[in-house]
Amino acid sequence: MAPCIPKKYTAGQNPVTKFEGAFVVTKMDPPEGRCFLFHTVINVNHHRVKALEKSGKKPPKHFHPNQYEYFKVISGQLTVEINDVEHILTPEDGEVTLEPGPHHRLWGTPGQKNDKVVFLISASTNARSYQLDQAFFENWYGYQEDMMMRGTAPDLIQVCCMFEAGDSYLSPPWWVPFRHFFGYWLTVILGYYIGSLLGYQPFFPEWTTDWDAACDKMASSLLQKKFAIRELQDVVKKNFDANGDPLPAKKLL
């Protein structure tokens, strides 16, 4: 295990295409009282999505203790698992509100008639510096894409580091007592304390559109302020082409 090194530059891109076109996310202006709003398209029949479905892998189950999350399906079907029960959302459901606390995860419903599920996702604002917001999603999906394209498994410490910075916490299995307690402290200890000491950071200039705001967050943290290097985004951007792909390494003479 080692801290992440981003392989693609997507900061400032809108819309953002992930997983070879399986996901397309457009950042929109959020309404009052919400900290982000994403228009998301998932191609459930894309070969990357089908491969995940075949493997049985699903997004990590987690919970948010301080924010409401909102889902609104525009077309297709979206599966949202809440406290280990799967719910299939459709346009007829309107906007669905997930209160703080439940263990949950979501994915495009497999086997549906439509190739694509289109939905809006947003969350309430939060007085905390670290919260579920655009910076979290930009980095989380950037990291997932890197892992998928390289065919490697996610690093648990890196995942916890990013989730803790998004005020989100991994959910232990259903049979673990005091799931919120253990999930919270597992994420904090691995992601913040151990991760920060080992050089893991929650936000990266390659993926974060508002890098200054991310630096403000990290600068407010005793263990993560060392990562708040504001000029770093201009430096790393020179290593990528206009499409965000890495430039060929220069040969030494």
Swiss-Prot record:
The cellular location(s) given in this protein's UniProt record come to: Membrane
**Which Cys-Cys disulphide bridges does the record give?**
none
Give the matching Gene3D superfamilies.
Jelly Rolls
Q: What does the function comment of this entry state?
A: Oxidoreductase; part of the gene cluster that mediates the biosynthesis of sesquiterpenyl epoxy-cyclohexenoids (SECs) such as anthrobotrisins and arthrosporols, metabolites that possess a novel hybrid carbon skeleton consisting of a polyketide-derived epoxycyclohexenol combined with a terpenoid-derived monocyclic sesquiterpenol substructure (PKS-PTS hybrid). The SEC pathway plays an important role for fungal soil colonization via decreasing fungal nematode-capturing ability.
Q: List the keywords (alphabetical).
A: Membrane, Oxidoreductase, Transmembrane, Transmembrane helix
Q: Look up the domain of life of the source.
A: Eukaryota
| GO terms, molecular function | oxidoreductase activity
Question: EC top class, in one word?
Answer: oxidoreductase
What organism is the protein native to?
Arthrobotrys oligospora (strain ATCC 24927 / CBS 115.81 / DSM 1491) (Nematode-trapping fungus)
Entry keyword annotation includes Transferase: no
Lineage of this protein's species? Eukaryota, Fungi, Dikarya, Ascomycota, Pezizomycotina
Q: Which family does it belong to?
A: Belongs to the oxidoreductase OpS7 family.
Q: What is this protein called?
A: Oxidoreductase AOL_s00215g277
Inducing or repressing factors: Expression is down-regulated by the cluster-specific transcription factor AOL_s00215g275. Expression is also down-regulated by the HOG1-MAPK pathway downstream transcription factor MSN2.
